Amino acid sequence: MTTPLPRPNRQLPLFSQAPSTPEDITRTTPLKATFDLFAQRLITDGKSDHTIVAFSADLDLLAAYQGEATPIGDIAITDLEGFFDWMENGRDVPCSRKTYARRMTTLKTFFKWLHEIGALRADPAKGLVQRSGPAPLSDVLSPAQLRDCIESSRTFTYKRGKDPDTRPEMLLRLLMDTGIKKNEAMALTPMSLVLDDPKQPVLQVRFKVRNVFKERNIDLASTWLPLYDAYARQYAPTAVIFDCTARNLEYVLSDIGDKAGLPFKLSFEISRWTCGLRDLRAGMTDDYIRQKLGLSDISWYETGGKLRELDRRLHERGE
């Protein structure tokens, strides 16, 4: 049997007037009456349709629990903690770790917005803590391990000859600088490189969101260009930069890690986490890293937390 909701689902009175602009929202505004303006803010911020639909569904669930007509100023952190406890333990509907994390992101984003527009003096969701068990942390390269990998990437020879193979170091540095995924790397073409300013080359990455291709630009280190030029002379890429199978590049990374003596297998995923961690340690903002990695707000909630935990663990080891 489904546990009854702690509060009645009160409908908004018919005579209530919904706010038409964010400035109209005050602490006495009913919870449900703020949702449309919040959705408009998400659209303005360029959030995907998927994110907007998911956030809206999460807020509808909060309204069902809290009461649609509850004034937003009456909602405290204890109410939100009760919502998550009910969601995990009081509903006869399974709540996966991913769903829990997304709803946490929804509430934090929503109440932060209400605070920023001046509707709330304090953000009741600011102190919410993720309680659902996180997925295991990925392995990540420490600064010393990255240096070892760079050194080992320079020890390969081209087609078992005497000339150095330029691909391992070029690939390694590309992944460490950009954090792109395996499928994104395989889709790169020479036209993906924007070299209008040699001092600040840019990589254009195309990625797919719900069958729609989008594009993000990632700054490249100018020191990477000579590596690419050497690679281009050796491999002469035409249609795509990496004219081989994805499995072949996986072998290249694995061999780099083996030669460097890593205690784990170097992969695209580990390279991606290492890139994010390096940016975090360099003082880049959360939004910068999120956009660079091509993540949604929902995905970033968990990813950002993991990056901070990885940073903490390396720091404790003096790395």
Predicted regions and their residues:
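N-terminal core-binding DNA-recognition domain of tyrosine recombinases/integrases
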Residues: D36-H50, S56-L137, Y158
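Active-site/catalytic core of tyrosine-dependent DNA strand-transfer enzymes
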Residues: D219-P263, C275
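Short, basic (Lys/Arg/His-rich) helix/loop patches that form interaction surfaces
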Residues: Y158, Y251-Q291, L295, E309-G318
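Alpha-helix N-cap/helix-start motif at helix boundaries, enriched for small hydrophobics
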Residues: L107, L171-L172, G179, N183-L188, ...
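Conserved tyrosine-mediated DNA breakage-rejoining catalytic core shared by Y-recombinases
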Residues: A187-W224
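Basic, Lys/Arg- and aromatic-enriched nucleic-acid-binding interface segment
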Residues: D148-K182
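DNA breakage-rejoining catalytic core of tyrosine-based enzymes
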Residues: L120, P134-S152, N211-S222
